[in-house]
């Protein structure tokens, strides 16, 4: 058999020599050796993380956290839910500023007053009883009586009374008797006004002539926000807000349903 000739193909030009950049090698000290950490179970000490979620908190903290979550998860009836709508900060500041002028006297002040009166009497100047100055009236029973007798000009209720049943009837009573009422944040702030740790509610009965204009303005703002909106407030339920896990689970189910429906429809 004759030998077949080899087909000569075109030679491809050699690639131009690529000038390689000389990378400067890092000088490694042989005395420093790598010790990579292994954060597996039972291996190296774990790095510092935010472990707030896993802390065993004191009982009172645990309870207040659970209560706040329950108020979000459960359906809260309008009578209780209305206490989540507190007065805005600006109006509340004005209200507290006015209320501060009508704080009841402390035990020391009363002692001083009676002592001065006794000294006057001993000096033979005669004992003339002084007129009682207008002060804030505090406490559920006192305020309820004042509202029923229509003697209260403005009622201020704390939003975080515990148990809430103590004051849950007050907004309805105030509205029925035509007394302006408002809900303000923190029973401690009201307590400070009347020299106590906390206070459920306070009421204005009388004010000095120079403060009547300021009180009238507050009453007008309060009526617009609470008394006039009573029908709207008593329709609004609260809570029923799911947590992130439940939201994620429902979203996953919805996604799966949508996918299944899409495959059925083709």
From Swiss-Prot:
Residues 104-135 are annotated as: Disordered. One of its GO terms (biological process) is maturation of LSU-rRNA. One of its GO terms (cellular component) is cytosolic large ribosomal subunit. Its main location: cytoplasm. Keywords: Cytoplasm, Ribonucleoprotein, Ribosomal protein. It is found in: Cytoplasm. It comes from the Eukaryota. Pfam families: Ribosomal_L7Ae. The keyword Membrane does not apply. GO terms for molecular function: RNA binding. Residues 104-130 have a biased composition (Basic and acidic residues). PROSITE patterns: RIBOSOMAL_L7AE (PS01082). Component of the large ribosomal subunit. The ribosome is a large ribonucleoprotein complex responsible for the synthesis of proteins in the cell. Belongs to the eukaryotic ribosomal protein eL8 family. PANTHER family: RIBOSOMAL PROTEIN L7AE FAMILY MEMBER. Component of the large ribosomal subunit. This is Large ribosomal subunit protein eL8.
């Amino acid at each position: 058999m004759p030998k077949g000739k080899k087909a000569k193909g075109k030679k491809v030009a050699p690639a131009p020599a690529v000038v390689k950049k000389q990378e400067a090698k890092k000088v490694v000290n042989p005395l420093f050796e790598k010790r990579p950490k292994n954060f597996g179970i039972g291996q190296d000490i774990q790095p510092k993380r935010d472990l707030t979620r896993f802390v065993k908190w004191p009982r009172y903290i645990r309870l207040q956290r659970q209560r706040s979550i329950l108020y979000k998860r459960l359906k809260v009836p309008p009578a209780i839910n209305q206490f989540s709508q507190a007065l805005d900060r600006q109006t509340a500041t004005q209200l507290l500023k006015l209320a501060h002028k009508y704080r009841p006297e402390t035990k020391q002040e009363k002692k001083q007053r009676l002592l001065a009166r006794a000294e006057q009497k001993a000096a033979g100047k005669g004992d003339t009883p002084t007129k009682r100055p207008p002060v804030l009236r505090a406490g559920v029973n006192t305020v309820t009586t004042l509202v029923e007798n229509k003697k209260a000009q403005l009622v201020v209720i704390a939003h975080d009374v515990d148990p809430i049943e103590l004051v849950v009837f007050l907004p309805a009573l105030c509205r029925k008797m035509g007394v302006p009422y408002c809900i303000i944040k923190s029973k401690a702030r009201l307590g400070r006004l009347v020299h106590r740790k906390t206070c459920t509610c306070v009421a204005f009965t009388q004010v000095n002539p120079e403060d009547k204009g300021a009180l009238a303005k507050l009453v007008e703002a309060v009526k617009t926000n609470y008394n006039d909106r009573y029908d709207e407030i008593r329709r609004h339920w609260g809570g029923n807000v799911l947590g992130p896990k439940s939201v994620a689970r429902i979203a996953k189910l919805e996604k799966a349903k949508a996918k299944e429906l899409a495959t059925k429809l083709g």
